[in-house]
Amino acid sequence: MATLQEVVRSVRRKGGVCNESTGIHIHIDFEPYDAQKLRNLVNIFASKEDMLYQALQVNSDREQHYCKKVDKRFLEELNRRKPTDLQTIKRLWYRDDREYHSHYDSSRYRCLNLHPVFTDNNIEVRAFNSCLNAGVLRAYISLVLAVSNQALTQKSASPRVTQSENPRYTFRTWLIRIGLNGQEFKNCRKHLLSHLEGNIA
């Protein structure tokens, strides 16, 4: 992580810039996943998507085109059928039985993108705005790794959307619960909570 942060700082020092038309995509290895754990991951993202979009300030253009929220039909079918094999999840994701789907398949434009699960053996999270702030980038990566760990270690997860009158407190509580606690992740929490309304007390 320290090496990556230094690379980002070096790019910024050399005059690198980013703009609103770009985003950060974070990929995680699919190797430790199975159908149940993948369903956990989908449900965790579905339940926290509204707060995530607020916390990460996903702009409306990206949300409508390149970083769409979970497909409700996919989510409903996934939890109704509770598949035990990846082939079934693949059919639900693409809505067809074709074996091959192109690299630029339209299904890829989701915040939680499962298209690379079936093409490159990884999972992509597309929710993040571009930035050259090393601390913010660390917060993004730490968040994805923590959510992935929750999906892998939790027996089950509900897709029920989290609602709160104090989203800052609720989101902070969740961050701590998934492992972003203590002094080590203090700055990560600061970055991830900075755009949410409410208080942490």
Where are these regions (language model features)?
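C-terminal accessory/tail domains of diverse enzymes
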Residues: 1-18, 31-201
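Short, conserved phosphate-binding/catalytic loop or strand-edge motifs used
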Residues: 20-24, 28
